[in-house]
Amino acid sequence: MTSATIPGLRGSDGQAPTEHSELLAWVQEVAELTQPERVVWADGSDEEWERLTDQLVEAGTFKRLDPKKKPNSFLALSDPSDVARVESRTFICSRSEADAGPTNNWVDPAEMRATMTELYRGCMKGRTMYVVPFCMGPLGAEDPKLGVEITDSEYVVVSMRVMTRMGKAALEKMGTDRPFVKALHSVGAPLAEGQQDVPWPCNDTKYITHFPEDREIWSYGSGYGGNALLGKKCYSLRIASAMAHDEGWLAEHMLILKLISPENKAYYIAAAFPSACGKTNLAMIQPTVPGWRAETLGDDIAWMRFGKDGRLYAVNPEFGFFGVAPGTNHSSNPNAMATMEAGNTVYTNVALTDDNDVWWEGLEGEPDHLIDWKGNDWYLRETETLAAHPNSRYCTPMSQCPILAPEWDDPQGVPISAILFGGRRKTTVPLVTESFDWQHGVFMGATLSSEQTAAAEGKVGTVRRDPMAMLPFLGYHVGDYLDHWIQLGKSADATKLPKIFYVNWFRRGEDGRFLWPGFGENSRVLEWIVGRIEGSADAEETAIGNVPRAAHLDLDGLDVDPADVDEALAVKAEEWRKEIPLIEEWFEFVGDKLPSGVRDEFEALKQRLG
């Protein structure tokens, strides 16, 4: 089939839906390479959603849920081999290997393009090729960050409508020549004539490849989440971090929270935690401290740049939440539950109840019988395997969140007063520490550490360094990335920089129990952080930073022994001396590009510890 005979290449009526010549040429080039049966330009309309979801139900990919309980919502079960991000098959193909750095997989870009071009040849035979224009962040931005994903997966088109500002409006924003990120995706499962499709097509060979200088993403073989929804980690973090480095801003793996004091003053906080450390729960916190309220602007990604007034402003580039389902319930995160229960949600790899609803571990009420994520019968107290996959997901529109901040769609973003780093540590790291200054805060972020959880490859429980929680998402050298943070701080007005804090909700006593109750009670720590911003809260200067005592926190009405809180806040020199060689080992791994400012902070810490 020549490109001239591929139906839909020039739009449904033969009139090209855009005059963007670079986009039209790229669509034609990809169609000629991948040989789809037809081309469809996605418009993001309700009609398109209805058509595609009906098609997915008919194909057996989607199961329509009970419209009374979960209106306009669907369950998808993936192939058991295609369930998570694959860090081992994720590549940063910068032109020079030195620019990828020690934390990324690198292949020469020319070699990678040749390999993947052969994989893409004819890979969409028998399928529809969708052209999906989208915008990351508000469409009204001065410099909108646009993208086009070409995909052969209806699941991807439907999910991109939830997760991004997708369709006709984004295409119009591109005009005739605006730059855009090219994101090419195929499940890698061509269909021969008359061949029966499977509910979840994918390929054992997988590549998730980024060409940072060319602003291109090539993904092959996976239909799942971050491997296939290329606006998410691939664009918003890996490609955007490279853009941000070139253009003088920050693309970060952070939630954005709006905290409102009893005096009705708003404070905006960005926070970076690795997977499974409570980012979504903090983003949607219900404060337990009387008079305090919280609203959310995002639970995963923040793009931050300095405004004309010298303050750092953040926007969330996403349009939906793509959250981990297990552990989410009406007490741990009532706002997330309300968001998805409003409908228009796609669930992946959770369990199905007998009355056509969804269930996962940690959700209230254990049913006697389920269909598990592999499509098998599951019986309470009899079946030994999990009903939902540990990385099962909900994909739901942000606009449905009951505590969504009104500024969520403001292209100017919100001014950030505090940046939090944090991880999951049983020992050593106090509940909260304030950095001495910006550079010391960058050192804190550079040495962020967390015990491995089921959300990442690797042995559960081992401590892994995860700089700014960006380890799997850096689009360039980690040393250059840390230096970018240092330089941005140096060029800013120090009095207007956000204060930087490090939190650890997960410290345990010698008997193994958690010393701090977490969840909504974390608002007591946030209240102290606001007090430090305002200069009204006390702290003790320690070797690692400024740390409160239990008496400095508002513990009214909290059923926790103040001695436990003091233990959660304790800075123990002997534990920190054990940390020193671990940090040294990490800095050796980063190599020659470790910024001198970060090294200076490390030397100063060693001296303070004596």
From Swiss-Prot:
Query: Which SUPFAM superfamilies does the entry link to?
Result: PEP carboxykinase N-terminal domain (SSF68923), PEP carboxykinase-like (SSF53795)
The EC number(s) this enzyme carries? 4.1.1.32
> Keywords, A to Z?
Cytoplasm, Decarboxylase, Gluconeogenesis, GTP-binding, Lyase, Manganese, Metal-binding, Nucleotide-binding
Name of the protein this chain belongs to: Phosphoenolpyruvate carboxykinase [GTP]
List ligand-binding residues for substrate: R85, Y224, G225, G226, S275, N391, S392, R393
Where is the catalytic site? C277
Instruction: List, in alphabetical order, the Gene Ontology terms for molecular function in this entry.
Output: GTP binding; manganese ion binding; phosphoenolpyruvate carboxykinase (GTP) activity
**Which BP terms in the Gene Ontology apply to this protein?**
cellular response to glucose stimulus; gluconeogenesis; glycerol biosynthetic process from pyruvate; oxaloacetate metabolic process; propionate catabolic process; response to lipid; response to starvation
Any GO CC annotation of this UniProt entry: cytosol
Superkingdom per UniProt:
Bacteria
Quaternary context: Monomer.
Cofactor(s) annotated in UniProt: Mn(2+)
- Give the function comment from the record: Catalyzes the conversion of oxaloacetate (OAA) to phosphoenolpyruvate (PEP), the rate-limiting step in the metabolic pathway that produces glucose from lactate and other precursors derived from the citric acid cycle.
Q: Which residues bind GTP?
A: A276, C277, G278, K279, T280, N281, R393, R424, F519, G520, E521, N522
Q: Which cysteines are joined by disulfide bonds?
A: none
